[in-house]
């Protein structure tokens, strides 16, 4: 089955789940009894409004609204395209991401935004970009037509989410797809099972862009700074707590790779594990400002957006290492931001070194790490066993933090990871350079 057909089928599933109000993720099986958590998989590719020629060659057939004269092609046509985008369930309704040609163009827009009926939710001159909310599409179209030459590109605020874990193949339903669980042995595969790691991560801030981190015994001695960008007042999804524990947990079986790390908890996704690229890009920039040296993003979207790409490239330019989950959709392409060259993308393997059946693969995959049956902390003080590229990414972020604290320069870390990776003989599209191991 090709990737496009998989996307189409998955979109149908997503729309059904949206209509039933059962969005969620299935990356964890709790060790306590409870209702099964629903699945939220990637939706079909969205036609993002951006220039026809994207920097990585993708999106050549996408609707173009940005290039000055193209924006001015017709108010009615533009209005129709905005309406079609706003009707999609794969975007935040009544929001748009605007990219400008210069800081001056962005500054001028901010001065006239209110008059144009636009609420600026966030803007940053480093990316020459703004996230806006609108109530009247006609007034937004007026702004775009009148000031078209100021814009580099525009597009919807695309949804991004915690990757769900698909059901295993029917023939292997009784043994989790035929995969061998790590449980508490994940660190042993990394080559650090009996090593004194108590100072690993010391002096290193790791930003966790996720669903938020809550109090847990495994994190009670870890310095955690909380930044809530969602601000919805809802309970936190336990996924973020799990990722933080895999990076810096200090308690027995929920122990992390680099327990001396400081965690910067950027909440960019809600209780259902759902966020948007506008918030994630904002979180990346604020994490850089806060002194993060590593950014873990165990979230993904199938849609390549210029704002998210620019944010990770900015982080890289500042010497910050971004690590992201490859995705759990069994596809031959990576989710974003893992799909960007500036990101250390991570696939999942089981305890026998085999690629997990759910793990995405594709060109540019950097490395693989334990991602099947991983023990971690969870909300409300619970311990869970979960599977996914989310866990693999978090373990890799912990490894990066450990290397930085051991005085490896950030520019050398990718090379160190590839040189020390365990070669399995599997194609690079499945495991990248191999399975993560630390020197």
Residue positions per predicted region:
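Primarily auto-inhibitory N-terminal propeptides
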Residues: 6-172
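Hydrolase catalytic cores
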Residues: 246-247, 268-269, 371-436
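C-terminal subdomain of the subtilisin-like protease fold in secreted/lumenal serine endopeptidases
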Residues: 5, 37-40, 45-46, 288-297, ...
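Protease zymogen maturation seam
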Residues: 149-205, 217-218, 430-432
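Catalytic-core segments of hydrolase enzymes
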Residues: 292-379, 416-421
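Short pre-catalytic strand/loop immediately N-terminal to key active-site residues, enriched for Gly-Thr
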Residues: 227-236, 355, 379-391
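Substrate-binding/charge-relay-adjacent region of secreted/lumenal peptidase catalytic domains
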Residues: 245, 274-294
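Subtilisin-like serine protease catalytic core
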Residues: 194-206, 211-225, 231-278, 340-342, ...
